[in-house]
C-alpha cells in the first residue's frame, strides 16, 4: 500500500474508489494499491 499525495491508475485493472473521504486505488496487482491521505 502506497500513501501518496496524488493517486493514479497504473494499469487498466486499477479502479479509483472513495471510502470515508479517502481516495484509494484497488487492483488485481497488490503492488498497485494506493491510498491518498
UniProtKB/Swiss-Prot annotation:
UniProtKB keywords: Ribonucleoprotein, Ribosomal protein
Keyword field contains Cytoplasm: no
Listed GO CC annotations: cytoplasm; ribonucleoprotein complex; ribosome
Domain of life: Bacteria
One Gene Ontology molecular-function label: structural constituent of ribosome
An example Gene Ontology biological process: translation
The family this protein is said to belong to: Belongs to the bacterial ribosomal protein bL36 family.
Name of the protein described by the UniProt record: Large ribosomal subunit protein bL36
Amino acid at each position: 500500500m502506497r500513501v501518496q499525495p496524488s493517486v493514479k491508475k497504473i494499469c487498466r485493472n486499477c479502479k479509483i474508489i472513495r471510502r470515508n473521504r479517502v481516495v484509494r486505488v484497488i487492483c488485481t496487482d497488490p503492488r498497485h494499491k494506493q491510498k491518498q491521505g
